[in-house]
């Protein structure tokens, strides 16, 4: 039996003492935890009043100490009592010295996947960690508890009543979770974009028409829609920004875009005549999942774009379109971003045909362009000499600004985020027309400004901005 976790330092500095697993005072319990225990200070003070000594600054140690506090020989009973005390998001892996052949798992608002093997069972927060060992998995739902041994796997609800779980088969190849000769995963995944695009788009275009058998959006339903609402986080939010420009142009319907983390706090105007488009690579993004549930509570129909089959967002959506990008292991998204954009266009074309809002010539032109994109991506990626040359010119710049109009603004936002994530260079993105409204005061001689001008109808004005 093994237990490990790569920890983001949300509580306490990165150090050995704050690393996982966290262990109870007696050493009986060891815990790994993904998430945040919101009431950990209150629980810590309670346990200290009971005479328990803490050695770390983590919220996770509170879980281990609570398990010890409630343990009377029944590990599952101690787990239930502990879960009833903690508030927040968690995916937990728990071992007890008294039961060395058992691993206990529990989740709330944080993904947890179980893997089925021969003479072994597995637990992970991401399915990519499992595909070296098994392709048969199931996804724990909120409030569920799992008990794993080498030979058996049981799942219970919050009252320890048995739960039957549906198995999912993961089609990803083992090689997809390996670097394949590249220095790091991001470089590999950048180079995989053309093939990911082909797998996502080509099977869905048949004889020049977009065919989305996964959807059942009737023309009458689409005509009755008052608007579309896009919800996402991070890079997926930038896809949502691009979706606004694209879908409004193709469907002639208003499109709103909101960060998932803000959706529940902005009193959204959503009804049963609103189609909510949820975008998430993992299908487990906590804020996005919470926003999805709120949208459904308000009566909206939810269509999701996700990359992981069987993920929570996919299961809870009314309709789902998968991006067949394969596992994306690098923190910074690449091929998932590209394929999400592709699916947005497929949705736009599919709905535009049903609504009759796009003339045949324009429909054919967009389809033809979509089919050419993988080849164009390959041409760009093959041009490594120029890419290296420009990188060598600009890597020392302290600040880099991205500007663009329409969809170029959305892509500029993603470019700026990528630069910050990967190079730690300060970067911001602005709508090109807003450059003169205060932003220009940040630009000095030598400041690098990256201007995106691919959107033909505005590129001329864009390029003639004052410099």
Descriptions of predicted regions:
Residues 19-21, 49, 108-111, 139, ...:
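Short, solvent-exposed amphipathic alpha-helical segments in soluble enzyme
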Residues 461-467:
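Conserved small/polar residues in nucleotide/adenosyl-binding loops
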Residues 1-179, 183-184, 195-226, 238, ...:
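Conserved short alpha-helical segments that host acidic/polar catalytic motifs at enzyme active sites
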Residues 6-17, 208-219, 244-279, 426-441:
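Glycine-rich oxoanion-binding loops at beta->alpha junctions
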Residues 193-197, 201-229, 319-448, 458:
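Active-site phosphate/pyrophosphate-binding segments
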Residues 129, 135-149, 276, 280-315, ...:
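Phosphate/diphosphate-binding loops
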Residues 62, 87-88, 130, 257-266, ...:
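Short acidic loop-to-helix transition motifs that present clustered carboxylates
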Residues 40, 236-242, 284-291, 313, ...:
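Short glycine/serine/threonine-rich phosphate/pyrophosphate-binding segments
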């Amino acid at each position: 039996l093994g237990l490990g976790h790569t920890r983001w330092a949300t509580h306490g500095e990165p150090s050995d003492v704050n690393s996982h697993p966290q262990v109870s005072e007696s050493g009986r319990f060891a815990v790994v935890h993904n998430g945040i225990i919101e009431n950990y200070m209150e629980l810590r003070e309670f346990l200290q009043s009971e005479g328990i000594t803490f050695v770390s600054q983590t919220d996770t140690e509170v879980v281990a100490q609570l398990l010890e506090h409630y343990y009377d020989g029944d590990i599952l009973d101690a787990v239930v009592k502990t879960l009833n005390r903690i508030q927040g998001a968690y995916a937990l892996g728990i071992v007890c010295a008294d039961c060395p052949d058992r691993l206990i798992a529990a989740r709330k608002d944080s993904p947890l996947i179980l893997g089925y093997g021969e003479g072994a069972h597995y637990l992970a927060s991401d399915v990519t960690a499992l595909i070296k060992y098994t392709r048969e998995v199931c996804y724990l739902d909120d409030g569920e508890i799992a008990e794993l041994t080498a030979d058996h796997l049981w799942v219970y609800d919050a009252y320890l009543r048995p739960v039957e779980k549906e198995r999912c088969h993961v089609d990803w190849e083992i090689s997809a979770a390996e670097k394949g000769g590249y220095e790091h995963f991001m470089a590999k995944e950048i180079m995989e974009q053309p093939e990911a695009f082909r797998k996502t788009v080509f099977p869905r275009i048949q004889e020049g028409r977009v065919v989305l058998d996964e959807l059942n959006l009737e023309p009458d339903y689409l005509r009755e829609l008052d608007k579309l609402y896009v919800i996402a986080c991070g890079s997926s939010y930038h896809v949502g920004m691009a979706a606004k420009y694209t879908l409004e142009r193709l469907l002639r319907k208003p499109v709103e875009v909101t960060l998932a983390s803000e959706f529940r706090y902005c009193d959204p105007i959503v009804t049963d005549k609103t189609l909510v488009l949820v975008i998430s690579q993992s299908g487990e993004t906590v804020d996005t999942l919470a926003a999805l549930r709120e949208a459904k509570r308000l009566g909206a129909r939810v269509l999701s774009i996700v990359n992981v089959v069987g993920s929570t967002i996919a299961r809870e959506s009314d309709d789902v379109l998968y991006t067949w990008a394969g596992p994306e292991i690098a923190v910074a998204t690449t091929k998932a971003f590209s394929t999400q954009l592709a699916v947005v266009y497929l949705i736009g074309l599919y709905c535009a045909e049903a609504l009759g809002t796009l003339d045949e010539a324009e429909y054919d032109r967009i389809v033809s362009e979509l089919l050419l994109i993988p080849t164009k991506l390959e041409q760009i990626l093959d041009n490594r000499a120029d890419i290296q040359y420009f990188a060598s010119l600009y890597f020392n710049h302290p600040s880099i600004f991205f500007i663009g109009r329409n969809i170029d603004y959305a892509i500029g936002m993603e470019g700026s985020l990528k630069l910050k994530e990967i190079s730690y260079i300060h970067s911001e993105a602005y709508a090109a027309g807003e450059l003169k409204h205060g932003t220009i005061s940040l630009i000095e001689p030598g400041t690098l400004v990256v201007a995106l001008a691919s959107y033909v109808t505005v590129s001329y004005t864009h390029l003639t901005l004052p410099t």
